Amino acid sequence: MANHKSSIKRIRQTIVRSERNRFYRTRLKNIVKDVRSAITAGNKEEAASAMGVANKQIQKFVSKGVLKKETAARKISRLHRAVNAI
């Protein structure tokens, strides 16, 4: 266990941030899954609307520091390419 007040606080902060990031990462996986399922169903309108939601949320996760901007750009690019291939 930590002995210093500052390290105890850091541990507390890490726990809170880890929980928050886990929530965001789970949400990201579900959003991407929605887009992928619309693509496999062949429903272009549903895939396009899900892509709009995914794009907005992925950019929000970048601003919150959950994702790096390069990772987000790669995810968005791959999803757009898959939607356009329908």
UniProtKB/Swiss-Prot annotation:
SUPFAM superfamilies: Ribosomal protein S20. Pfam families: Ribosomal_S20p (PF01649). GO terms for molecular function: small ribosomal subunit rRNA binding; structural constituent of ribosome. One of its GO terms (biological process) is translation. One of its GO terms (cellular component) is cytosol. Keywords: Ribonucleoprotein, Ribosomal protein, RNA-binding, rRNA-binding. The keyword Glycoprotein does not apply. Binds directly to 16S ribosomal RNA. Belongs to the bacterial ribosomal protein bS20 family. This is Small ribosomal subunit protein bS20. The lineage of its organism: Bacteria, Pseudomonadati, Campylobacterota, Epsilonproteobacteria, Campylobacterales.
